[in-house]
Regions:
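N-terminal "arm"/small-domain region of PLP-dependent enzymes with the aminotransferase-like
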Residues: 8-53
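Active-site phosphate-binding strand-loop segment of PLP-dependent enzymes
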Residues: 133-185, 196, 204
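Conserved N-terminal alpha-helix of the aminotransferase class I/II PLP-enzyme fold
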Residues: 39-91, 95, 109-117, 298
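Conserved C-terminal alpha-helix-loop-beta "cap" of PLP-dependent enzymes
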Residues: 298, 302-376, 380
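Conserved PLP-dependent catalytic core of the aminotransferase class-I/II
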Residues: 65-73, 272-307, 345
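PLP-dependent aminotransferase-like
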Residues: 87, 94-149
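Active-site C-terminal subdomain of aminotransferase-like
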Residues: 202-295
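Conserved active-site segment immediately N-terminal to the catalytic lysine
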Residues: 191-202, 212
Length: 398
């Protein structure tokens, strides 16, 4: 009997035979689209002014193809803004909040950051800050349609997404400001429930960092043209002058100088998505990645989802935790160090990069499952995660 147990342990510890052919699972910047190469950038408008006709044409093309791929309503404005998704969210909050009461819903790191903006940085008089722990959603049921609402569609650091937008009133008087950076292109957006939508190029599109996208409904534009906040607005955040929308932002005249090589790269990603089959195809890839992880967890004892409710599990930032009793006996510092060793082992074997959970999240694994991550690569990294976990566990126990 003892030799059978030893053989079983040996088989668990044996390295998987196959590695992902593209072992990149970072949650930002994320994996490049399949087949990407530097040749894709050869037509970039390099050495040209970003306000030249050639550059503005490319910037406008980013706007137009984003609308096409995301199926954004025609009466919504789309702008390219500085400082990635963070810049887009904060310019919306600083330019639009203050007219009404505001509710900020958060359940992971970046949502908590918007909570800090509303709760500590902006002098808002009427505010409700509604938080939930990692792995859970806050209670949306008492949301007041007279208030402005700030929330993330998908919590990137928790792997928890909203179930639906039923809690947002069609007769709302307030604005909804949605950080959708790890949701767009991999999840269907309920555009008519959203007034301000933000995201970056570096997430599901697999493009480069530092550039954000800001999408405004007609109601959001009306707010900018009828309300001026009582605090100063830096130029980098400014969307209106004297209650008049700076419309150039939404036609390729960016607030500051964009990287034209990054512009070319995001155009490549948008073209890839359109040629692949559009939004539904991108969503299908990502949802299949979640199913692969779910099926693997169902058959193994080492991990569980951070999100307990299956309906809230993200198909992009897929967060899993060790669940065996041995791991639970470790103190917090040892849990963090243990998972660092697991991820270091995966990297040293070139089986998977950047799989560690976010620094403020419970120690675990975060697999990026966005649409640029091919299903086969997710399928192949899972046995490697098992192997790395068991191998590290044996070393830790000695």
């Amino acid at each position: 009997m003892a030799w059978l147990i030893c053989l079983w342990i040996f088989n668990l510890m044996e390295k998987p035979a196959q590695k992902p052919h593209y072992p990149y699972f970072s949650s930002g910047p994320c994996a490049k689209p399949p087949g990407w190469s530097f040749d894709n950038l050869k037509n970039a408008a390099l050495s040209r002014s970003h306000s030249s006709g050639a550059a503005v044409k490319k910037l406008q093309e980013v706007i137009d193809k984003s609308r096409q791929l995301l199926e954004i309503p025609d009466d919504y404005l789309i702008g390219i803004v500085p400082a990635s998704d963070t810049g887009a969210v904060e310019m919306a909050m600083w330019c639009m909040l203050g007219q009404r009461g505001v509710e900020v819903y958060s359940w992971e790191n970046f949502g908590h950051d918007w909570n800090i903006d509303a709760g500590e940085q902006l002098p808002l008089k009427d505010k409700k800050l509604i938080k939930a722990e990692y792995g859970e959603l806050p209670d949306f049921s008492n949301s007041n349609p007279d208030n402005d609402i700030v929330f993330t569609w998908n919590g990137t650091t928790a792997g928890v997404r909203i179930k639906n937008t039923d809690w947002i009133s069609n007769q709302r008087k307030g604005l909804t400001i949605c950080d959708a950076t790890s949701a767009v292109f991999s999840m269907h957006m309920d555009w008519h429930k959203l007034d301000v939508i933000t995201y970056s190029w570096q997430k599901v599109l697999g493009s480069e960092a530092a550039h954000g996208m800001l999408i405004l409904s007609p109601r959001a534009v009306e707010r900018l043209e009828t309300f001026t906040p009582p605090w100063p607005i830096p130029k980098i955040f400014r969307l209106a002058n004297n209650q008049k929308l700076i419309s150039g932002i939404f036609s390729g005249a960016t607030i500051n100088t964009p990287s034209m090589i990054s512009v070319e790269d995001v155009l490549n990603s948008l073209n890839w998505g359109l040629e692949l089959g559009g939004l539904n195809k991108l969503i299908d890839i990502s949802e299949t990645n979640l199913k692969l992880v779910n099926n693997w967890i169902d058959k193994h004892d080492n991990f569980e989802f951070l999100a307990k409710d299956p309906e809230t599990r993200s198909c992009t930032s897929i967060c899993i935790l060790p669940k065996d009793e041995w791991f639970k006996t470790l103190n917090d510092e040892d849990k963090v160090n243990f998972m660092k060793e697991v991820c270091s082992l995966l990297e040293s074997n070139e089986a998977g990069y950047d799989l560690n959970s976010y620094k403020t999240a419970p120690p675990g694994i975060r697999i990026w499952g966005g649409s640029t991550v091919e299903n086969k690569n997710v399928e192949l990294v899972l046995p490697w995660i098992d192997w790395a976990y068991l191998t590290t566990k044996e070393a830790f126990k000695k």
